[in-house]
């Protein structure tokens, strides 16, 4: 139990008028540590108990069980709690040393599934930094949900259907080179796509031909289907090479095409429930009672189904297949209206499990303040960016530690980790400006800074030849150690907050705080001096490294032991 929860529970025993959660939220940290570690203001009880806050504080301080604390004193209208730092540090260190990387593992999920729709790039289009956010936020949330006891199901809902495939088939049949496509699938397919679109601007027959090929594809034509499948397979090979570099895996690659034969059921269900209304020849579902002004357009006047129809089919399939406790869509904020409609239509269909669906939105990545766009050529491709980040990391590692073994693997961990961490430390609803130099810096609030703190601790532990014993009691009570102990003790709550808010930046900021607190401790404390505190300090180092490494893992970032 963390200290705030302990204090709230002890106060609740003598103040039945307030819920423990309300007490927890009222607790304050005094500005001056001489006034205690935490304080409870008695003002909130004045009306209920009809007494002055000073009198309430004085009476309650007498009633609270002091055995868990160093002391409990009333100071004016506050009850001030002085924690038994030696006792708490001993408990926290024992928990981390005993559990190792399982420290702070929780069982909220009880093994239930969480479906995570993430990454989802378009086939035959380059994988840019714009796709990175959905990929790394989704991957981090998968780690967090697993730590909370859920079973994450990571779904890459590929953009593998649409009229652009008609254009691609026309282009490939005109100018395609099988060997070139196999060597560089995305580059070659993109060149073909750009070239055919340029030709279509002056030749109207191109569009007609593309429409005809897409119609053939929809009808299951053998040649069209084989070409589409080949474009998809070759693109996916290239995407998977990138995912391997990012250390991101998926449980399903069911993309848009997978739901082609599942949309008729959606239309039948909507029809059976009398939810479809005709509007200008199209079929819509009115959602005004959900505060949504624009109806959901289900089927166009020409009979074509729309994106939302496909997403309805996907939602039904995922519920039946995974029986999810939560279904999470990690998609840019520009799709907010779409996901509000999606949830509302499912609710209207009588599916209360739509309440378990969450759009985890995020802001844009810009470059020099400008929005990135594949169409305008203002795009940052991920593959060369990752390579550049690794090179920059390698240069810094070479300068700091030229004799480091396994330099390539460490440079990869630092370069890739730098890009991921920079993205994840940003509150997801905020965008950020892409700055590779800032990302790969070993100074400031960066991934390499946190990784370096972890590597520094591992170096200390190697020099000391120290491994903690689960049967030894370690304890510290000095102010610098206490700052670190408080953070380590707070780790389970940080994981829960990150999970509840679908917000990996909470975890990233925690990792930065812990690294900063340790570096401050390292600067002021002679850890390796041979005195009575040596093993206690080394146990603290061990616990800090364990939690730092786990915090980074939950962000999808590796923690090298040497840098």
From Swiss-Prot:
Signal peptide: none annotated. It comes from the Bacteria. GO terms for molecular function: arginine-tRNA ligase activity; ATP binding. PANTHER family: ARGININE--TRNA LIGASE, CYTOPLASMIC, ARGINYL-TRNA SYNTHETASE. GO terms for cellular component: cytoplasm. Keywords: Aminoacyl-tRNA synthetase, ATP-binding, Cytoplasm, Ligase, Nucleotide-binding, Protein biosynthesis. Monomer. It comes from Streptococcus pyogenes serotype M6 (strain ATCC BAA-946 / MGAS10394). Its EC number is 6.1.1.19. It catalyses: tRNA(Arg) + L-arginine + ATP = L-arginyl-tRNA(Arg) + AMP + diphosphate. Belongs to the class-I aminoacyl-tRNA synthetase family. This is Arginine--tRNA ligase. It is found in: Cytoplasm.
């Amino acid at each position: 139990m963390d200290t705030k929860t302990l204090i709230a529970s002890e106060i609740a025993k003598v103040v039945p008028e307030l819920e423990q959660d309300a007490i927890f939220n009222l607790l304050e940290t005094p500005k001056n540590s001489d006034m205690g570690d935490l304080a409870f203001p008695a003002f909130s009880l004045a009306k209920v108990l009809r007494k002055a806050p000073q009198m309430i504080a004085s009476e309650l301080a007498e009633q609270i069980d002091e055995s868990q604390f160093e002391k409990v004193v009333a100071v004016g209208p506050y009850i001030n709690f002085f924690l038994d730092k030696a006792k708490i540090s001993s408990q926290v260190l024992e928990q981390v040393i005993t559990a190792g990387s399982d420290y702070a593992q929780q069982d909220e999920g009880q093994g239930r599934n969480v479906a995570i729709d993430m990454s989802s790039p378009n086939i035959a289009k380059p994988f840019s930094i714009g796709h990175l956010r959905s990929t790394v936020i989704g991957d981090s949330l998968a780690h967090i949900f697993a730590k909370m006891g859920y079973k994450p199901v990571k779904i890459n809902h590929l953009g593998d259907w649409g009229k652009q495939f008609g254009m691609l088939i026309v282009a490939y049949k005109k100018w395609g080179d099988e060997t070139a496509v196999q060597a560089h699938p995305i580059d070659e397919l993109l060149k073909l796509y750009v070239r055919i679109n340029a030709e279509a601007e002056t030749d109207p027959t191109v569009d007609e031909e593309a429409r005809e090929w897409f119609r053939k594809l929809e009808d299951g034509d053998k040649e069209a289907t084989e070409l589409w499948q080949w474009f998809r397979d070759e693109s996916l090979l290239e995407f998977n090479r990138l995912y391997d570099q990012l250390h991101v895996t998926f449980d399903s690659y069911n993309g848009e095409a997978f739901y082609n034969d599942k949309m008729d059921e959606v239309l039948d269900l909507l029809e059976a429930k009398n939810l479809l209304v005709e509007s200008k020849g199209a079929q819509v579902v009115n959602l005004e009672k959900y505060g949504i002004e624009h109806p959901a357009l289900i089927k166009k006047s020409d009979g074509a189904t729309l994106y939302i129809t496909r997403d309805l089919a996907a939602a039904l399939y995922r519920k039946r297949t995974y029986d999810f406790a939560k279904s999470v869509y990690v998609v840019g904020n520009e799709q907010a209206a779409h996901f509000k409609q999606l949830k509302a239509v499912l609710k209207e269909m009588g599916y209360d499990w739509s309440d378990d669906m969450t759009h985890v939105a995020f802001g844009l990545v810009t470059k020099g303040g400008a929005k990135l766009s594949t169409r305008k050529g203002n795009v940052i491709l991920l593959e060369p960016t990752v390579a550049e980040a690794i090179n920059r990391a390698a240069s810094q590692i070479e300068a700091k530690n030229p004799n480091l073994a396994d330099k390539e693997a460490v440079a990869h961990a630092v370069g890739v980790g730098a890009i991921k961490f920079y993205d994840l430390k940003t509150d997801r609803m905020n965008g950020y400006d892409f700055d590779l130099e800032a990302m790969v810096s070993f100074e400031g609030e960066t991934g390499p800074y946190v990784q370096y703190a972890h590597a520094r601790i591992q170096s200390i532990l190697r020099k000391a030849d120290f491994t903690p014993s689960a049967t030894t009691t370690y304890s510290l009570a000095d102010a610098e150690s206490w700052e670190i102990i408080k953070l380590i003790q707070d780790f389970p709550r940080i994981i829960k907050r990150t999970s509840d808010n679908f917000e990996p930046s909470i975890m990233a900021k925690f990792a930065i705080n812990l690294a900063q607190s340790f570096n401050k401790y390292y600067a002021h404390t002679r850890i390796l001096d041979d005195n009575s505190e040596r093993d206690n300090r080394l146990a603290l180092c061990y616990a800090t490294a364990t939690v730092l490494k786990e915090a980074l893992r939950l962000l999808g970032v590796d923690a090298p032991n040497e840098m």
